[in-house]
A protein has these predicted regions:
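Elongated, amphipathic alpha-helical interaction scaffolds
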Residues: 1-194
Length: 194
């Protein structure tokens, strides 16, 4: 493949594509802007990002994370992008979260020291088919419907539903080959073609 052919191929990448997302996620500013929008927290700070982190498991399946962000409040946030709808996505999120949690634990840790983790799962389809751009999946006590805080937040976002919200507008940018939106300056600076 010639250099010109490679340049043409790169022009077709969109933020939802794994290869391009890896490049975007390497920019702390892009990750911070994205998470502030998705998690609806204007004060959220991303201190560090580890892109394509391989979490090894000597006894079974390992996992490769798209982006693992370390937040200013000490929480970790795993961001995954998924185009294919040929998987059990809830179990994938559960598996990834468990691997990250185990990898971050020490032999003598008390369970109260278990990390707080957010998993943001961005998909090119509406995983729950309920017509929402964002879903928060919580642990609840079935009998009382009370939410239980076990330190894991699961947030599913998609690029399909267009509901007029800022999150929906941002997710629509993930489908574009070129982004030019003043509301999202960090993403625009990385994806805009001059």
């Amino acid at each position: 493949m010639t250099l010109e052919e490679k340049k043409e191929q790169v022009k077709n990448f969109r933020p939802i594509d794994d290869t391009f997302f890896e490049v975007l996620a390497d920019d702390i500013g892009v990750c911070q802007e994205m998470l502030r929008i998705i998690l609806e927290d204007e004060k959220l700070v991303v201190k560090d990002v580890i892109v394509q982190s391989s979490e090894r498991n000597l006894y079974g399946r390992s996992v490769r994370l798209d982006a693992l962000c370390i937040l200013g409040n000490g929480k970790k946030c795993n961001v995954e992008v998924q185009r294919s709808n040929k998987d059990h996505h809830l179990k994938r999120v559960r598996f990834n979260a468990s691997v990250i949690t185990v990898r971050d634990s020490q032999t003598d840790d008390k369970f109260e020291e278990t990390i707080d983790l957010i998993v943001v799962y961005i998909s090119e389809f509406d995983i729950f088919k309920r017509g929402r751009v964002i879903y928060h999946v919580d642990s609840v006590i079935r009998e009382t419907q009370e939410k239980v805080d076990d330190g894991l937040e699961r947030v599913f976002v998609n690029t399909v539903v267009k509901d007029g919200t800022t999150i929906s507008e941002y997710m629509d940018c993930f489908l574009q080959k070129e982004v030019d939106n003043v509301k999202f300056p960090k993403l625009t600076n990385r994806v805009h073609m001059p």
